[in-house]
């Protein structure tokens, strides 16, 4: 599979968007949030089941629950719309 890590430039743009997004919590550990976004990217590229998420991205169930929260809050939809015009 191709590398799903974000470049520093990509992460900076995503992080700046998320800081303005009231329903997306980055937290004090920005690297953990970056790993979360990379985990979602890995899932979308691999088509795998959540339980097969590599451990380097964190606990699959925690990543899944956060993904679902962001889905329900519309974070992903707004992010995609934002970057579609970028």
Language-model segments: which ranges?
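Short alpha-helical elements
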Residues: 1-86
């Amino acid at each position: 599979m191709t590398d799903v890590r974000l470049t520093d430039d990509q992460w900076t743009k995503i992080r700046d968007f998320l800081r303005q997004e009231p329903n997306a919590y980055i937290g004090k550990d920005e690297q953990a949030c970056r790993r979360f976004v990379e985990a979602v990217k890995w899932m979308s590229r691999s088509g795998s089941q959540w339980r097969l998420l590599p451990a380097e991205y964190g606990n699959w169930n925690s990543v899944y629950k956060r993904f679902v929260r962001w889905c329900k809050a519309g974070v992903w939809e707004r992010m995609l719309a934002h970057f579609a015009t970028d």
